[in-house]
Curated annotation (Swiss-Prot):
It is a multi-pass membrane protein. Its main location: membrane. The gene is SLC10A3. The chain crosses the membrane at residues 225-245, 253-273, 281-301, 320-340, 361-381, 383-403, 417-437, 450-470. This is P3 protein. Residues 1-21 are annotated as: Disordered. GO terms for molecular function: bile acid:sodium symporter activity. GO terms for cellular component: membrane. It comes from the Eukaryota. It is found in: Membrane. It comes from Bos taurus (Bovine). Keywords: Membrane, Symport, Transmembrane, Transmembrane helix, Transport. Belongs to the bile acid:sodium symporter (BASS) (TC 2.A.28) family. Gene3D superfamilies: 1.20.1530.20.
Amino acid sequence: MVFRSGEGHSLQWPGPEGGTGCTGPQSMLRATLLLVSLLWGARGTPSASLSPALGHPMPLTRGRYLSIGDGSVMEFEFPEESEGIIVITSQYPGQGNGTGPSPMLRVTSLDPEVLAIKNVSSIALGSGGSFVVSIRSGLPGIAPLHIQLTDPREAPPRLIEERRDFCIKVSPAEDTPITLGTDLVHFSENPILYLLLPLIFVNKCSFGCKVELEVLKGLLQNPQPMLLGLLGQFLVMPFYAFLMAKVFMLPKALALGLIITCSSPGGGGSYLFSLLLGGDVTLAISMTFISTVAATGFLPLSSAIYSRLLSIHETLHVPVSKILGTLLFIAIPIAAGVVIKSKLPKFSQLLLHVIKPFSFVLLLGGLFLAYRMGVFILAGVRLPIVLVGFTVPLVGLLVGYGLATCLKLPVAQRRTVSIEVGVQNSLLALAMLQLSLRRLQADYASQAPFLVALSGTSEMLALVIGHFIYSSVCAVP
């Protein structure tokens, strides 16, 4: 049975190692709640999106002692940002006879960001007993419970029963506009964003007009730079994100945001940085085009694999179809630009001239939206994800340059491969998260791509300044 406490208040229960319980009105209230729960059972909402074990009523099998309510429901709904209790009934014989230490219950939430366990206390009742678990919900999602009933009379304590089939579904509030003041609404509802979308589409089409078909044909004959870029972007960097998520024990939503960010194709003005740092610009444009097209297959695959390895799929639905749709929004106009340049070269030149004045508008609009995003996304940001976000571009640059050096590519191509792996399209990852998840989850997960974008831009600008200073002092081309 799951109860929600009154808004702004929580029912305080002693933990298993604490005192013996409350007295007075609180004790009477607790006993009343317990009796009601035992008589009426629990109200649960099976979910069609879960596995059969969670989504359908399952009878209490013989030999099981623990249950919530009548044992027929495995999933229970609870509102976000609330406090309450769960009543777990135990039919283990001897719990209520008072002849010795009673069995102990340990309850663990497998996603503490969604549901936190505050404490557990026991109540003896007849031949059995019950446990009252105090909980606090956080972000919307599904938090599986790991429940263990142990006998403390033996050394070490004997495991009587273990349950992993119960879960708490924390339901989000209605997605009403979130305000941080009288005039500040969520950036996703800003009309400037919708005004910029057509310009982004045309800008990507004009980028496709810059792709040289001869360079693409040359990459097919000598594919080493292209293969190294794909290897770094879609194999090494996602694996690095997986390692960082494990090392820093990132919450599930943040881990998903980091995986998608590190699985994103090249972008973010990488060809511009190649120009400023003495790289091969035509190669950079071609590699960005190839990685964007390849991402339509590799990014959803990478996200699905690492979501499984990190057990993200247990609490968050990884929206592969929406991820693919966002990628196609970028890949299709770029591919259209390549076709336009091949079939209508004069029109492609016109398109390139027309888009130039609007590039400044896109830049200003992007800076404005970045500020508005930061107000929401970086609220409550923590040190671990800041450190990880700072290292991602640096690791990408080192991985790309190291791979290119191993194959002894020319210096210009080494720099290009390094930049293509290190400067990923973090804003594309942010867009995928915002379009795929609920608002609170999306803003939380978007901390990863937002910080990577900030770090990458700052680090690349520092490299450009350092390169100019070094080139002017040492006369290096």
